[in-house]
Swiss-Prot record:
PANTHER family: 30S 40S RIBOSOMAL PROTEIN, SMALL RIBOSOMAL SUBUNIT PROTEIN US4M. PROSITE patterns: RIBOSOMAL_S4, S4. InterPro entries: Ribosomal_uS4, Ribosomal_uS4_bac-type, Ribosomal_uS4_CS, Ribosomal_uS4_N, S4_RNA-bd, S4_RNA-bd_sf. Part of the 30S ribosomal subunit. Contacts protein S5. The interaction surface between S4 and S5 is involved in control of translational fidelity. GO terms for molecular function: rRNA binding; structural constituent of ribosome. NCBIfam families: PRK05327.1, rpsD_bact. One of the primary rRNA binding proteins, it binds directly to 16S rRNA where it nucleates assembly of the body of the 30S subunit. Belongs to the universal ribosomal protein uS4 family. Transmembrane segments: none annotated. This is Small ribosomal subunit protein uS4. CDD domains: S4.
Length: 208
């Protein structure tokens, strides 16, 4: 399955909540979900009743789109999570949240996960002082993430950092905005991650 390249705001409207795919726009009244809180298309405003399978599929699609992960990789993450000793939904969130592109986004060095993925793949991000250009790289507690010195002056990075200064820092991260550096202190707990997705329905879908 190829990566989606169409208008990302339509994805948020289809799910019925913000996936935070458009960067700073998602935090303003210009957000498509705020302006047009119904699904795209001719019959988008009509009420549609989904089957149980349909609801499970919607939950999976929403989580995949939020983190920018394709089906094959998402299934692998689910298999990893299902082998953990803790509850599968919680483990799945920890796996997704520890992706390097997501950590760069959570630290406020990029305005969206897509932009964070580009920063990583183009070699602008260091992990413990070494360049890592794999967006799916799994960050571990204690790892130090920073933007390369030459890349700190890039306009998208500077704009993202300035916009993030007034937002609440995730409790599992320590961030130095002036240095464009942060520490992944620990894995987040499920209740600390604001994701309006029914994780249990995803577990049921993959358990069939």
């Amino acid at each position: 399955m190829a990566r989606y390249t169409g208008p990302v705001c339509k994805l948020c409207r289809r799910e019925g909540f913000k996936l935070y795919l458009k960067g700073e726009r998602c935090f303003t009244p210009k957000c498509a979900v705020v302006k047009r809180p119904f699904a795209p298309g001719q019959h988008g405003s009509a009420t549609r009743k989904l089957t149980q399978y349909g609801m499970q599929l919607r939950s999976k699609q929403a989580l995949k789109r939020m983190y920018g992960v394709l089906e094959k990789q998402f299934r692998r993450y689910f298999e990893i999570a299902s082998r953990k000793s803790e509850e599968t939904g919680t483990a799945l969130i920890k796996v997704l949240e520890s992706r390097l592109d997501n950590v760069v986004y959570r630290m406020g060095f990029a305005s969206s996960r897509k932009q964070a993925r580009q920063l990583v793949s183009h070699g602008h991000v260091l992990v413990n002082g070494r360049k890592v250009n794999k967006a799916s790289y799994s960050v571990r507690p204690g790892d130090i993430i920073e933007i390369k010195e030459k890349s700190k002056a890039k306009v998208p990075v500077k704009e993202a950092i300035e916009a993030s200064r007034n937002r609440t820092t995730p409790p599992w991260l320590e961030i130095d905005f002036d240095a464009a550096r942060g520490t992944f202190v620990r894995f987040p707990e499920r209740e600390e991650v604001d994701i309006p997705v029914d994780l249990q329905s995803i577990i049921e879908l993959y358990s069939k």
